[in-house]
Amino acid sequence: TGRARQGTIRAPQFTGGGVAFPPGMRSFDVKVNRKARRAALRGALSHHAANGTLAVLDAGSFESPSTKQAKGVLEEWGKDAPVLVVAHEDEEAVVRSFRNLERVLVTVPAELEVAAVVWARALVVTEGALPLVEQRAGKEASA
């Protein structure tokens, strides 16, 4: 009768059976070349610099973490959120001051991404983080 060839009744050819070629897990990660990634970061930073939405912050003014002081700095500057704050790893007071503000993203230069720079309407970089940001966006490879 051919019944033995069919296998189980849960095989794809039977009603109520499985799916022959179901959708599987798929990774949508895309590899971007290092030079292209750096060029994109340079372009995004240049855009902020040209539009006047890039500010350099003196981290020394934050002796202790103060969200109130951080909010005052942003209000004094007068730029709309969202804001990206790039601070050096050692500037813990700045990181703690800005991290609790709404629509403010705080990151370190080693984790700076093009998407975050493009997302932000304003960019604040501390003096300690500025050389590291320049190095990350530079044309030459960094060690």
Stretches found by the model and what they are:
Residues 22-143:
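Extended polybasic, low-complexity segments that bind anionic RNA or targeting/receptor surfaces
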Residues 1-21:
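Glycine/serine-rich anion-binding loops at beta->alpha junctions
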